[in-house]
C-alpha cells in the first residue's frame, strides 16, 4: 500500500515538473515575441498579467485552474519579461542574463531536490512567505512612483532572492507532503513557474546592478 502511494506521489511530481518545464518553454516563446510587441501594449499586458495572478489565487480555491490558463499566463508573462531582460542586457551585457538564468536554474534544482526529499513538513513557512511576498509587492509598487536608489534596489533584490528561494523549497516540499490530486497539477506547476521567474528577475536585477556599479 505504501509503495503504491509513493509511486502515485512520484507520478504526480513528474507530471507537475513536466508541465512546469512546458510553461518555461512557452514563456521563452513569449519572450522572443516580446521584442516585436509595441511598447504601448506592455502596460496593458502587465495589468493583464497581474489580473491573471489574482484570478489564479481565486480559482485555486475552486480547483478551476486549467492547463490553458497556465500556458496563456506563461506566454503573457514571457512577453512582459522582455523589457526587463532587454534593459539589463543593454546596460550590463547579455552575459548577465545568462548568469542570472544559470544561477536560477542551479538554485531551483538544488533547493527543489532538498524540498522534495525533506522528511519535515515545511507548511509552517506559508504565513511567513505570504507576508514576505506582500511586503515585496508593496515596495515594488512604491518603487514605481518613487524609484529606489541602487543600494536599496540591491537590498530589495537580495531579499527577493531569499524569499523566492524559500518558496521553491516550500512548494516542492508541499507537493511531497500534501495529497495532490490531478486537478491541482496545473496550479502547482504555475506556483513553481512563478517561483522560478521571480527568482530569475531578482537575480537579474542583482547582477545587473552589480555589473553597472563596477
UniProtKB/Swiss-Prot annotation:
Keywords, in A-Z order: Calcium, Calcium transport, Cell membrane, Ion transport, Membrane, Transmembrane, Transmembrane helix, Transport
According to the record, the segments passing through the membrane are 16-37, 45-59, 67-86, 96-117, 123-146, 152-175, 186-207
What catalytic reaction does the record list? Ca(2+)(in) = Ca(2+)(out)
GO CC terms of this entry: membrane; plasma membrane
Note the effect listed for residue 171 to E: Results in constantly open channel with reduced Ca(2+) affinity
- What happens when you mutate residue 195 to E? Results in constantly open channel with reduced Ca(2+) affinity
Keyword Disulfide bond set for record: no
Q: Which InterPro entries match?
A: Bax_inhibitor_1-related
Activity control mechanisms: The calcium-release activity is mediated by two factors: pH and transmembrane ion gradient. It was proposed, based on an MD simulation, that the conserved aspartyl dyad (Asp-171-Asp-195) regulates Ca(2+) binding, pH sensing, and the channel pore opening and closing, and that protonation of Asp-171 probably weakens its interaction with Arg-60, facilitating the opening of the channel. Another study using nanodiscs suggests that Asp-171 is not a pH sensor regulating the pore dynamics; instead, it is only involved in the gating of calcium ions.
Sequence ranges on the Cytoplasmic membrane side: 1-15, 60-66, 118-122, 176-185
Q: Which domain of life is it from?
A: Bacteria
The text the record gives for the protein's domains is:
BsYetJ in nanodiscs is structurally different from those crystallized in detergents. In lipid nanodiscs, BsYetJ conformation is pH-sensitive in apo state (lacking calcium), whereas in a calcium-containing solution it is locked in an intermediate state, inert to pH changes. When crystallized in detergents it shows a pH-sensitive conformational equilibrium between a rather flexible pore-open state seen at lower pH and a pore-closed state seen at higher pH. BsYetJ appears to be a lipid-sensitive membrane protein: differences in membrane lipid composition lead to changes in functional sites.
Report the protein's function: Calcium channel that probably plays a role in the regulation of calcium homeostasis. Uptakes calcium ions and mediates calcium flux in proteoliposomes in a pH-dependent manner. When expressed in E.coli in the presence of high extracellular calcium concentrations, shows calcium-leak activity, increasing intracellular calcium concentration. It can also mediate Ca(2+) flux from the endoplamic reticulum (ER) when expressed in permeabilized mammalian cells. Calcium transport activity is also detected in ER-like lipid vesicles.
Tell me which family the UniProt entry assigns to this protein. Belongs to the BI1 family.
Question: What name does UniProt use for this protein?
Answer: pH-sensitive calcium channel
Amino acid at each position: 500500500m505504501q509503495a503504491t502511494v509513493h509511486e502515485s506521489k512520484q507520478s504526480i511530481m513528474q507530471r507537475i515538473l513536466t508541465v512546469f518545464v512546458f510553461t518555461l518553454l512557452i514563456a521563452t516563446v513569449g519572450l522572443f515575441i516580446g521584442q516585436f510587441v509595441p511598447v504601448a501594449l506592455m502596460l496593458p499586458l502587465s495589468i493583464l498579467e497581474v489580473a491573471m495572478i489574482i484570478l489564479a489565487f481565486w480559482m485555486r480555491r475552486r480547483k478551476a485552474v486549467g492547463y490553458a490558463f497556465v500556458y496563456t499566463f506563461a506566454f503573457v508573462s514571457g512577453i512582459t519579461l522582455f523589457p526587463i531582460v532587454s534593459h539589463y542586457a543593454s546596460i550590463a551585457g547579455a552575459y548577465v542574463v545568462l548568469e542570472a538564468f544559470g544561477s536560477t536554474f542551479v538554485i531551483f534544482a538544488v533547493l527543489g531536490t532538498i524540498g522534495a526529499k525533506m522528511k519535515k513538513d515545511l507548511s509552517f513557512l506559508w504565513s511567513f512567505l505570504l507576508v514576505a511576498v506582500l511586503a515585496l509587492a508593496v515596495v515594488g509598487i512604491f518603487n514605481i512612483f518613487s524609484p529606489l536608489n541602487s543600494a536599496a534596489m540591491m537590498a530589495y533584490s537580495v531579499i527577493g532572492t531569499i524569499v523566492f528561494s524559500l518558496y521553491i523549497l516550500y512548494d516542492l516540499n508541499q507537493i511531497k507532503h500534501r495529497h495532490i490530486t490531478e486537478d491541482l497539477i496545473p496550479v502547482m506547476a504555475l506556483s513553481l513557474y512563478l517561483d522560478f521567474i521571480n527568482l530569475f528577475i531578482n537575480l537579474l536585477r542583482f547582477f545587473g546592478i552589480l555589473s553597472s556599479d563596477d
